[in-house]
Regions:
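Hydrophobic residues in beta-strands and at strand termini
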Residues: 62-64, 117, 163
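Hydrophobic beta-strand-centered segment that forms part of the acyl-chain substrate-binding groove
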Residues: 89-128
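Conserved beta-strand residues within beta-sheet cores
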Residues: 45-48, 61, 110-114, 128-130, ...
Length: 174
């Protein structure tokens, strides 16, 4: 697997579908040792998504492999949920950091998220996840996100992500 801008691609089988939006990705810039299954750069068996900011929308492109499928040609719903959870959490954390006017990314956790699987997500091409913060306070952000393939939205998500304080089990875990 190689990273091409915001696109994870199989060796030689795909070209870049999305131009590089920000270098490096948020995960590489703020948490290079993170081992999270969905977004950890240091997890060789994880999804290793790369989140980029494009205007006020956060974008990641994921290239599914056969072991990410529920059945042939369709991404597993758990993988869809993981993409939403991790990518939306990064959108929330970065938003809260810029809202506070600092360069310190706050450790955030998922308070809740609701996924609507509108139709099967095809696994034979790039899966584009877009997330946007729609509400926020000093310590929490609500994010709405979509997954699309070939311009068709296959699922949506709305979640709340909260910055945690010292003493919380997730404080600076990534």
């Amino acid at each position: 697997m190689t990273v091409c801008g915001a696109v994870v691609q199989r060796s030689g089988s795909r070209r870049c579908y999305v131009r590089q939006l920000m270098t490096p990705a948020l995960q590489d810039l703020y948490a290079p040792q993170n081992k999270c299954f969905g977004c950890g750069p240091a997890n060789p068996k994880g999804l290793r998504i790369k989140s980029f900011l494009n205007g006020d929308v956060f974008v990641t492109t994921f290239m599914p492999e056969t072991h990410h499928e529920a059945w042939e040609g369709v991404v597993n719903g758990g993988i869809v949920g993981c993409l939403f959870d991790c990518h939306s959490n990064w959108a929330a954390a970065y938003h809260l950091m810029t809202r506070a006017g600092t360069n310190d990314l706050p450790p955030t956790v998922t308070a809740d998220f609701h996924v609507k699987l509108r139709k099967p997500t095809p696994s034979k091409g790039p899966v584009i996840v877009k997330a946007k913060v729609v509400e926020s306070t000093d310590d929490r952000a609500t994010v709405e996100a979509t997954i699309e393939v070939d311009g068709v939205i296959t699922s949506t998500c709305r979640g709340t992500f909260v910055a945690v304080k010292p003493g919380h089990p997730a404080y600076h875990r990534w």
